[in-house]
Amino acid sequence: MALKVFNWLNRKKHSNVEYCTINENKAMEEKEDSLRASVTEQDTEALLLRDVLINGILAIGTLGHNVNSLCPESCIEQDEPIIMCDEKVEQEKCEEEKAEAKQDTPVTAPSEPASALEPAKMHSSSMKEDNFMCFVKEEILMHGMEVEDVPNIQERPLLMLEKVEKVRTTLADLFAAEAFSSSDAEDKCYPKIVIVAGASTSKPTSCMEKMHHKKPTKPTSKPLKATRKLSRVMRKMLGKKIHPEQLNGRSNAEGPVTA
């Protein structure tokens, strides 16, 4: 409130208004023009403020410019006719150049250079077509490899491995290797024998024979008769002061018999 009062006093003291006589008709026309200008300015400002946020982006410094410059659709619509005009101009230029070239070339000119150039053009075009076809075939093959099923791709390494011959070691190979190694060991164990006149020619025992030589086992005893078994058991019991009936689980009230 204090600022408003201060501004009012400042305007009253420092008034720069110049009074002069003006024709009423001119004043009315100027007033109408100013009103129209203010209305149009307000409308454009409102449109600009409405179009400031295009696609969620705040455009700073665009007030006072053309509204259509803020709309991308209008820009695209303006660019399309320009592009079409450029294309038409280029086509017209090409047609004019072709017509001039036809006029410049004489009708009675020999056709030998043209016929010489035609095979070269045909060869180059055929080479381009072949390259293009090769490229297309490679692309199709690559696409087919990508589209193949996963199980086929997983089975392929297994199939490739089956084609390779595997060398397997069998039991026969192991036994043969063991026999070969044992024969080598026997050859090493045999010392060099020098035959001397009058000496014995008996071969010394090999190392493997000594290793495999077993100690003589004791002869198994013959089975004892029933009477001998019983007598042996009776001796043991009498020596330990045990009655024979106690072995069968019977209890004697009188106690064991002492010898």
From Swiss-Prot:
Record keywords: Growth regulation
Motif IGT motif: where in chain: 56-62
Organ and tissue specificity: Expressed in the leaf sheath pulvinus, tiller base and tiller node.
GO aspect biological process, one term: morphogenesis of a branching structure
Family label: Belongs to the TAC family.
Other remarks in the entry: Plants silencing TAC1 exhibit erect tillers with a very small tiller angle.
Protein name per its UniProtKB record: Protein TILLER ANGLE CONTROL 1
Gene name linked to the record: TAC1
